């Protein structure tokens, strides 16, 4: 066995001589043009830190930086992710927000929806046009009859029928009662979220009186199913118009009391002025409607621009804001309640006599007295409520000025007694999409005020 053997090194480092049995590598004379050897990273790291007397503590020591700039890990602040809702009392139902906070400031707001999804639009396709009506009460369950009104107008447009004048006046009357119901809920719960409890208790007593009007006319306090295609279900009972007049006469005093407590209140103004500001351009780009649009200074009200039923025969003003903040939207809602009282008084004074259902046997069921004497009327009633009436093929988009904004129904008929497709346009969906824009840069407590001013109900958003 030879004492020495030559081993050619790889990558031009040079030949190395390996002594037999020793394991010691001796670098040979580098050849001409060979590259200089560079230590690898692992070789260099073994000399970093404390090398003199290594121990468990000193092994992790590092030399100080040469430029005297050392970033400590304790000073690196990361944003906090906070889950707001769906159990939070200020979430107005089942709203879940994923908030990214920098300290107390909101950097990002991500709404998560769908926790109240019930598949309403699909369920409607399996019901007749009359059986689908109660689903609309349960969409925006704070303004029930306004939803019914939009659906009934859409079906009437496809059927090419028009309800009698008395039915139209009754619709407008209860549509404005519903608007007051909604705005009471919006304003007082907004105040309750911020910390003012008294208006909530004051105004809910008035709200109970309006629920009584609902009950006297339909039998139900909330989900009335009263406004139907072709008119309304029943005529107004005796004495109801007198009681509505007494209510409207005294209700303006309740509004004055709430305004006296809130409008010039220092705490209320600090919590709402310049909070959640939306410019007119942003409001249009996000698809806002209703008070959210009018609060930014755009005078757009479907009762004025595209009148339905008898809104072209009543006089009222459309309040608009100037700054587009929470305070302006509060003032708009309060003034809209006063304008609704004006419309209610005009409806009571101009209420005509006559029928409350369209004179069309294919749509309107026979009267109870006829059913007790005529077998044909009984059969007609049975067929109408089991099979329904056939609607000519076509499609329509019908929108009304609901209390929260533009509530639209896109209805497609294929000629059968069931809708082929019913698409519901909820105003709160677009408002919730703008929550990130409205709350960015505000404090965490201001997010509650912004949710309250949007007047969100998840029955119509999740559907």
UniProtKB/Swiss-Prot annotation:
Topology with respect to the bilayer: Peripheral membrane protein
Residues with Symmetric dimethylarginine modification: 118
Keyword Cell division: no
Compartments where found: Mitochondrion inner membrane
Free-text description of this protein's post-translational modifications in UniProt: Dimethylation at Arg-118 by NDUFAF7 takes place after NDUFS2 assembles into the complex I, leading to stabilize the early intermediate complex.
GO function term, MF aspect, one: oxygen sensor activity
Keywords: 4Fe-4S, Acetylation, Electron transport, Iron, Iron-sulfur, Membrane, Metal-binding, Methylation, Mitochondrion, Mitochondrion inner membrane, NAD, Oxidoreductase, Respiratory chain, Transit peptide, Translocase, Transport, Ubiquinone
Targeting presequence: 1-33
EC top class, as a word: translocase
This protein's record includes keyword Transport: yes
Residue numbers bearing the N6-acetyllysine modification: 62
Cofactor list: [4Fe-4S] cluster
Any one biological process term the GO annotation gives: mitochondrial electron transport, NADH to ubiquinone
Cofactor comment text: Binds 1 [4Fe-4S] cluster.
GO cellular component: mitochondrial inner membrane; mitochondrion; respiratory chain complex I
E.C. number(s) listed in UniProt: 7.1.1.2
Catalytic activity, as annotated: a ubiquinone + NADH + 5 H(+)(in) = a ubiquinol + NAD(+) + 4 H(+)(out)
Function as written in the Swiss-Prot or TrEMBL entry: Core subunit of the mitochondrial membrane respiratory chain NADH dehydrogenase (Complex I) which catalyzes electron transfer from NADH through the respiratory chain, using ubiquinone as an electron acceptor. Essential for the catalytic activity of complex I. Essential for the assembly of complex I. Redox-sensitive, critical component of the oxygen-sensing pathway in the pulmonary vasculature which plays a key role in acute pulmonary oxygen-sensing and hypoxic pulmonary vasoconstriction. Plays an important role in carotid body sensing of hypoxia.
PANTHER family xref list: NADH DEHYDROGENASE [UBIQUINONE] IRON-SULFUR PROTEIN 2, MITOCHONDRIAL (PTHR11993:SF10), NADH-UBIQUINONE OXIDOREDUCTASE 49 KDA SUBUNIT (PTHR11993)
Family: Belongs to the complex I 49 kDa subunit family.
Name the UniProt record assigns to this protein: NADH dehydrogenase [ubiquinone] iron-sulfur protein 2, mitochondrial
């Amino acid at each position: 066995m030879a004492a020495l053997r030559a081993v050619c090194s790889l990558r031009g480092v040079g030949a190395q001589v390996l002594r037999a049995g020793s394991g010691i590598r001796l670098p040979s004379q580098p050849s001409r043009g060979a590259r200089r050897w560079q230590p690898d990273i692992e070789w260099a790291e073994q000399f970093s830190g404390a090398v003199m007397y290594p121990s468990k503590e000193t092994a992790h020591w590092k030399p100080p930086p040469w430029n005297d700039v050392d970033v400590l890990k304790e000073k690196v602040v990361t944003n906090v992710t906070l889950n707001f809702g769906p159990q939070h009392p200020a979430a107005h139902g089942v709203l879940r927000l994923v908030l990214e906070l920098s300290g107390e400031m909101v950097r990002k707001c991500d709404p998560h929806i769908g926790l109240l999804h019930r598949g309403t639009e699909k369920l409607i396709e399996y019901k007749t046009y009359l059986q689908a009506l109660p689903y609309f009460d349960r969409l925006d369950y704070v303004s029930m009859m306004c939803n019914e009104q939009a659906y009934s107008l859409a079906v009437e447009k496809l059927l090419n029928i028009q309800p009698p004048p008395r039915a139209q006046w009754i619709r407008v009357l209860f549509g404005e009662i519903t608007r007051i119901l909604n705005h009471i809920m919006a304003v007082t719960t907004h105040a309750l979220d911020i910390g003012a409890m008294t208006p909530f208790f004051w105004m809910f007593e008035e709200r109970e009186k309006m629920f009584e009007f609902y009950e006297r006319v339909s039998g139900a306090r909330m989900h009335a199913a009263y406004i139907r295609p072709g008119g309304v279900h029943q005529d107004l009972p005796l004495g109801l118009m007198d009681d509505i007049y007494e209510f409207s006469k005294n209700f303006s005093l309740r509004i004055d009391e709430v305004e006296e407590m809130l409008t010039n209140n220092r705490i209320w103004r600090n919590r709402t002025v310049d909070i959640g500001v939306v410019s007119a351009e942003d409001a249009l780009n996000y698809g806002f409607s209703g008070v959210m649009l009018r609060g930014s200074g755009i005078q757009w009200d479907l009762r004025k621009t595209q009148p339905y039923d008898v809104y072209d025969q009543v006089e009222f003003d459309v309040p608009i804001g100037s700054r587009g903040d929470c305070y302006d939207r509060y003032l708009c809602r309060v003034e809209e309640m006063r304008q609704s009282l004006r419309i209610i008084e005009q409806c009571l004074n101009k209420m005509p006599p006559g029928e409350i259902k369209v004179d069309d046997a294919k749509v309107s069921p026979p009267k109870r007295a006829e059913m007790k004497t005529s077998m044909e009327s009984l059969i007609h009633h049975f067929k109408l409520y089991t099979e329904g009436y056939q609607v000519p093929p076509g499609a329509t988009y019908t929108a009304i000025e609901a209390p929260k904004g533009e509530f639209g129904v896109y209805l497609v008929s294929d000629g059968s007694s069931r809708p082929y497709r019913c698409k519901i346009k909820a105003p709160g969906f677009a408002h919730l999409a703008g929550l990130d824009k409205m709350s960015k840069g505000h404090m965490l407590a201001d997010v509650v005020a912004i949710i309250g001013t949007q007047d969100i109900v998840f029955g119509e958003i999740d559907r």
